[in-house]
């Protein structure tokens, strides 16, 4: 079966090949082509099963209309919702989204970004990257703009959550509930993730500030969990929390991984 070309579509539509190309590439408004004609050509192209030659289009426009994103985890609801919304917004703008999971491994992050750049993506979104500045430097060398999401960098624009403000509000709520139920105030036990990352550090700073504002001493009920493997979480929780189970009045956890560790390690008494 003969492959349909732009010239075939032009003959079927009764317009020039350049007009067909402009319509299929989304540039028909700039050429002052009517919406009615654009709709007609698009319909004929769909009926004929025509597929745009992206490589040829990219050579002409120097744009691939592809946007790449790296994320650290697929099984995390936070990153999963980010990926889903990213795809929706990309398609709304006529872009093809490419997403890959790098599992917070620096070598996978760099490998993924290099692969995206080799396919000449127009943008790279680095979500939760371990070294966002290294990714930004690679993209800058290739002339590709990048943005950091979730974890900030210094070489590209960054969009992050207000972990500090959220932790202040949450700590206030937990303390208020504890005082109402027990009739007295008591410090919380803080269980954080990796201490060097921005989210646990911000949450810890905000929570200790809020606890102090209630007139409570910030006792050393602080546990940093060095890894997210279940065995590590279970061991850390058993050794650090079992001795305090009688006096603990509440917990403040940064993410779901410490919560999994708390449940796995302290199942006997939680």
Curated annotation (Swiss-Prot):
<dbReference type="InterPro" id="IPR000843">
    <property type="entry name" value="HTH_LacI"/>
</dbReference>
<protein>
    <recommendedName>
        <fullName>Ribitol operon repressor</fullName>
    </recommendedName>
</protein>
<keyword id="KW-0238">DNA-binding</keyword>
<keyword id="KW-0805">Transcription regulation</keyword>
<dbReference type="InterPro" id="IPR001761">
    <property type="entry name" value="Peripla_BP/Lac1_sug-bd_dom"/>
</dbReference>
<dbReference type="GO" id="GO:0000976">
    <property type="term" value="F:transcription cis-regulatory region binding"/>
</dbReference>
<feature type="domain" description="HTH lacI-type">
    <location>
        <begin position="1"/>
        <end position="61"/>
    </location>
</feature>
<dbReference type="Pfam" id="PF00532">
    <property type="entry name" value="Peripla_BP_1"/>
</dbReference>
<keyword id="KW-0678">Repressor</keyword>
<dbReference type="InterPro" id="IPR001387">
    <property type="entry name" value="Cro/C1-type_HTH"/>
</dbReference>
<dbReference type="GO" id="GO:0003700">
    <property type="term" value="F:DNA-binding transcription factor activity"/>
</dbReference>
<keyword id="KW-0804">Transcription</keyword>
<comment type="function">
    <text>Repressor for the genes of the ribitol operon. Binds D-ribulose as an inducer.</text>
</comment>
<dbReference type="InterPro" id="IPR010982">
    <property type="entry name" value="Lambda_DNA-bd_dom_sf"/>
</dbReference>
<dbReference type="InterPro" id="IPR028082">
    <property type="entry name" value="Peripla_BP_I"/>
</dbReference>
<dbReference type="Pfam" id="PF00356">
    <property type="entry name" value="LacI"/>
</dbReference>
<feature type="DNA-binding region" description="H-T-H motif">
    <location>
        <begin position="6"/>
        <end position="25"/>
    </location>
</feature>
